[in-house]
């Protein structure tokens, strides 16, 4: 592989910490002041995690999974000047339908946040006769309009590409069952309008490597590079103490993201700290 160059626009004022002295192994490292957000920074929320963050104007904006004190997860909005110190809205995001009427999911968790052209999209897992993909759009982070049930159940881990490919929206997902499924591969689908999805293609599945021998699923939005779409994804292994989730990497073809050009043999990050 030749030297890879970024094509996706750089994130302005992104917080950065140089590689720790003596660091070896994977080419990524943890921020030394982790965790940057406490367990329950919002009243009535027992745990907040699984964030999706991006720049918005002169600040950063994020959507977060917040598990309420009754255990039901919803999506909460947060704002930050530096992506490290966060202020959260006290109330969960209020979704509406195309007519502006309330359209709230029974639950919502594991959000992703992606901007395509002039619109921001939130993608999450919701209930639609089991685990299913939820999508909403906004331009001002004040009004959040849901797109009704874009995929059949059971599906989750939806990841939207940050630009159209051949004029269509592209999305990764992981069809599965309705529980903590012990299986799952990554697929890619396309749509002309974010409503009707088709041309479903298989991207990749689990491997013989132990860290991703059970199932895999999409992570953050793909990053466009000179070699293709850089995808960070999660791989899962099963242990006698439960599932272990690690981060892997792959590069997908720029014009046909169902083609995997490169894939990491080893994980990039795996749980090591107390907060993980």
Ranges and model annotations:
Residues 1-106, 114-214, 223-276:
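Beta-rich carbohydrate-recognition and catalytic domains
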Residues 220:
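Catalytic core of Fe(II)/2-oxoglutarate
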């Amino acid at each position: 592989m030749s030297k890879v160059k970024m094509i996706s626009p750089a994130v302005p004022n992104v917080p950065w910490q140089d590689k720790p002295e003596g660091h070896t192994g994977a080419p990524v490292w943890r921020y030394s002041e982790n965790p940057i957000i406490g367990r329950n920074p919002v009243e009535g929320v027992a745990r907040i995690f699984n964030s999706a963050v991006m720049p918005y104007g002169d600040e950063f904006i994020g959507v977060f999974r917040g598990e309420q004190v009754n255990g039901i997860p919803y999506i909460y909005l947060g704002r930050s000047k530096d992506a490290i110190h966060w202020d959260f809205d006290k109330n969960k995001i209020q979704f509406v339908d195309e007519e502006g009427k309330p359209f709230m999911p029974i639950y919502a968790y594991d959000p992703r946040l992606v901007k395509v052209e002039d619109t921001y999209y939130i993608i999450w897992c919701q209930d639609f006769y089991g685990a299913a993909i939820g999508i909403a759009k906004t331009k001002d982070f004040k009004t959040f309009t849901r797109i009704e049930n874009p995929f059949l159940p059971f599906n989750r881990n939806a990841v939207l590409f940050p630009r159209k490919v051949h004029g269509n929206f592209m999305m990764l997902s992981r069809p599965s069952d309705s529980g903590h499924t012990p299986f799952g591969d990554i697929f890619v689908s396309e749509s002309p309008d974010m409503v009707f999805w088709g041309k479903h293609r298989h991207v990749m599945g689990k491997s013989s490597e132990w860290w991703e021998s059970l199932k895999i699923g999409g992570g953050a939005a793909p990053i466009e590079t000179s070699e293709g779409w850089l995808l960070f994804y999660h791989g899962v292994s099963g242990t006698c103490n439960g599932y272990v989730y690690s981060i892997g990497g792959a590069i997908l073809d720029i014009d046909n993201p169902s083609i995997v050009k490169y894939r990491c043999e080893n994980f990039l990050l795996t749980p090591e700290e107390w907060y993980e």
